[in-house]
């Protein structure tokens, strides 16, 4: 019965869209006080309403980031976003429209080849490294807004954004005193303590904000304790953020903001128990300890009515350790360490003639250096690497409005990247010194016949740079791979009722990838990265938001997807689908809040079947699955108390299988229940 329901799901949601269109006829005559929230998308370097943003987007803003009290990380929001498959903490970043956000390399392959993620995650303008994203927790505490942008963002962000971007923005200091304290408690030894205080240092001139959070829980898998990791089941995260905001009273067109952020996380490499009877897995689970400290300095100055100058300076240091058995204890032990630092500078000039022309132009400079070592017996013992990356780019965007009904936007980015990676062991040595210059254009034509309807087409080019690596299984060889490119084409439409209580949105997309970086197996445990000549993906994202009454809000989303590796000679996977690329994903959400402060809500998420990897092995095939999450809460003047239950029916289906052994499966996280209390002052 469940399988039949899942198969009919796209038809059911399509019917829901049709019924909501019918609603529009009477909308203007039934305007109510409560309207849908108007969101502003900032992740594409300009402030643009979500309604007018061509990019397929899902925006979570305060106070709706965490209604349940249990949305603690960005991964919890990505799981609510259609056409994404998020597995949680571990090697594999989310897939977006079937494209693996991790990039072509994860795990040991990434340690030798370096990391080239395809999904960019930024917090207050600083992009997280692969290890921070994969094994850390991107805390939602004290966040103002989180934007999920699907599709290539290379023209905006350059490298590492060919699949999309997750843009997180924390709250700014306030000129009035405010604060909050949150305590959370749940099963699986879940604990959460968070606090924030904000207020003026010099009234109307200088304000500060200090926030901190500590999260911890215990993995549901029965990993055994050992040295040097201790208990691998411990999942912990500490996040401290301090902000200073200068807004001179005598210069209202100027502000300067300093953000200091420190994160430290600890988590098992993944929550897969694995078949410890096989030679592939040890019973001792590796643990990643990830830390970073960064400073971000933003300056904005409205020069006159037509020009505004913004400048961003970012400096960060990060440190990642893979704790595991040393080789002297076990030949299968693979401890590793990575230390790095980065610098980013980005000035941007915004212009507008207060009429038909507006846009921006800027420079981007990025430089990083990291030192790595990894012990692995099959590749000569200790391997050390020196990795240096520099990026210089010019970018610009202009929107011309020939009339009130038309907007024509042209954007481009010219980027030069240089990547040096050297190292290895005595047996094999890697020496990469390569640069490339790419031109990344975008064109967007929007038609706005009324204030209630926007429709348009857009085309953009994306890319991700190449690299080099060493295999860690026989045959052991060095290799290089080239950059990958994508031509993205989309048609989009947005419609809302006159009373702003119903909004429909849709994006149809077609992606032509050239030289997509995919694994190529030389042997059972020997994998290199090569470039597939052609990969095509196409599909759609549809969404509806309806404020049915002043107290009741309904949301629904549907993602449709088809992927195919069109040309990859001699790989054995030509003609296959990409991994973690279900034909459909969907969600239905509800929130009820009455004027007495009582609240209840939840969502149901559906995933069609998919293959775990591009080899499309039957042993890695995942069946369709779903999950139900519920919460209830009471809101009062100075706070809120909520009860939550995620995975209410305790579904425990496999969602990812990392090898040919079905015992090596990642399962849905067991039912989690708990309580969260927040006090504001």
Summary of predicted features, one role per range:
Residues 404, 408, 416, 510-512, ...:
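Gram-negative outer-membrane beta-barrel transporters
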Residues 298-302, 306-326, 448, 455-460, ...:
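Membrane-embedded beta-barrel scaffold of Gram-negative outer-membrane proteins
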Residues 34-176, 491, 659:
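Acidic, small-polar-rich N-terminal luminal/periplasmic segments of exported/outer-membrane proteins
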Residues 1-85, 111, 198, 253-256, ...:
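N-terminal Sec signal peptide and the immediately downstream disordered periplasmic leader
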Residues 253-261, 290-324, 332-435, 441, ...:
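Face-selective signature of the C-terminal outer-membrane beta-barrel domain
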Residues 606-613, 632-681:
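C-terminal beta-signal and adjacent terminal beta-strands/loops
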Residues 183-187, 214-218, 260-266, 315-319, ...:
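Transmembrane beta-strands of outer-membrane beta-barrel pores
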Residues 178-180, 185-217, 221-267, 291-297, ...:
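Transmembrane beta-barrel wall of Gram-negative outer-membrane proteins
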């Amino acid at each position: 019965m469940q399988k039949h329901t899942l198969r009919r799901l796209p038809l059911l949601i399509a019917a829901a869209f049709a019924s909501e269109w019918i609603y529009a006829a009477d909308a203007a005559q039934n305007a109510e006080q409560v309207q849908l929230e108007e969101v502003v998308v900032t992740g594409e370097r300009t402030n643009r309403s979500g309604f007018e943003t061509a990019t397929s987007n899902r925006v979570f803003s305060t106070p709706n980031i965490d209604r349940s009290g249990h949305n603690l990380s960005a991964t919890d929001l990505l799981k609510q976003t259609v056409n994404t498959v998020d597995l949680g903490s571990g090697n594999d970043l989310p897939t977006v429209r079937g494209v693996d956000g991790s990039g072509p390399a994860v795990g040991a392959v990434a340690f030798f080849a370096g990391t080239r993620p395809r999904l960019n995650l930024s917090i207050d303008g600083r992009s997280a490294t692969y290890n921070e994203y994969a094994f850390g927790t991107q805390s939602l505490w004290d966040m103002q807004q989180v934007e999920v942008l699907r599709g290539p963002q290379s023209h905006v962000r350059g490298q590492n954004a060919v699949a999309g971007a997750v843009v997180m923005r924390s709250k700014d200091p306030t000129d009035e005193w405010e604060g909050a304290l949150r305590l959370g408690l749940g099963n699986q030894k879940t604990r959460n303590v968070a606090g924030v205080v904000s207020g003026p240092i010099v009234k109307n001139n200088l304000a500060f904000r200090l926030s901190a959070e500590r999260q911890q829980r215990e993995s549901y898998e029965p990993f055994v304790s050992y040295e040097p990791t201790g208990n691998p089941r411990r999942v912990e995260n500490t996040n401290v953020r301090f902000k200073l905001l200068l807004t001179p009273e005598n210069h209202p067109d100027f502000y300067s903001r300093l953000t200091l952020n420190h994160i430290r996380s600890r988590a098992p490499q993944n929550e897969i128990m694995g078949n410890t009877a096989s030679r592939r897995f040890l019973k001792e689970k590796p643990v990643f300890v990830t830390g970073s400290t960064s400073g971000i300095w933003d300056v904005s100055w409205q020069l006159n009515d037509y020009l505004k100058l913004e400048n961003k300076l970012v400096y960060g240091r990060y440190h990642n350790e893979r704790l595991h058995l040393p080789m002297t204890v076990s030949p299968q032990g693979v401890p590793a360490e990575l230390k790095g630092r980065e610098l980013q500078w980005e000035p941007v000039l915004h212009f507008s003639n207060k009429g038909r022309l507006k846009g921006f132009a800027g420079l981007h400079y990025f430089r990083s250096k990291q030192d790595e070592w990894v012990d692995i017996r099959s590749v000569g013992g200790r391997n050390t690497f020196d990795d240096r990356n520099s990026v210089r780019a010019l970018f610009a965007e202009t929107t011309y409005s020939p009339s009130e009904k038309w907007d024509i936007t042209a954007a481009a980015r010219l980027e030069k990247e240089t990547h040096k990676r050297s190292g290895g062991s005595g047996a094999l040595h890697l020496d990469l010194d390569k640069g490339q210059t790419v031109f990344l254009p975008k064109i967007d034509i929007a038609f706005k016949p009324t204030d209630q309807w926007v429709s348009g087409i857009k085309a953009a080019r994306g890319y991700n740079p190449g690299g080099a690596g060493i295999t860690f299984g026989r045959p052991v060889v060095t290799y290089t791979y080239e950059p990958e490119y994508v031509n993205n084409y989309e048609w989009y439409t947005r419609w809302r009722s006159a009373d702003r209580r119903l909004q429909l949105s849709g994006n149809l997309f077609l992606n032509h990838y050239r030289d997509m970086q995919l694994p190529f197996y030389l042997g059972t445990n020997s994998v290199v990265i090569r470039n597939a000549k052609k990969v095509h993906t196409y599909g759609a994202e549809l969404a509806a938001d309806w404020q049915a009454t002043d107290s009741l809000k309904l949301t629904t989303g549907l993602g449709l997807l088809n992927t195919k590796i069109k040309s990859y000679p001699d790989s054995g996977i030509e003609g296959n689908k990409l991994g973690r690329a279900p034909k459909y994903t969907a969600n239905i959400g509800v929130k009820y809040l009455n004027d007495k402060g009582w609240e209840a809500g939840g969502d149901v998420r559906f995933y069609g079947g998919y293959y775990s990897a591009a080899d499309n092995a039957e042993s890695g095939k995942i069946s369709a699955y779903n999950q139900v999450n519920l919460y209830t809460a009471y809101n009062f003047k100075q706070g809120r108390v909520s009860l939550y239950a995620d995975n209410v029916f305790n579904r425990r289906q496999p969602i990812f299988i990392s090898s040919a052994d079905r015992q090596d499966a990642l399962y849905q996280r067991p039912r989690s229940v708990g309580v969260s209390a927040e006090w504001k002052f």
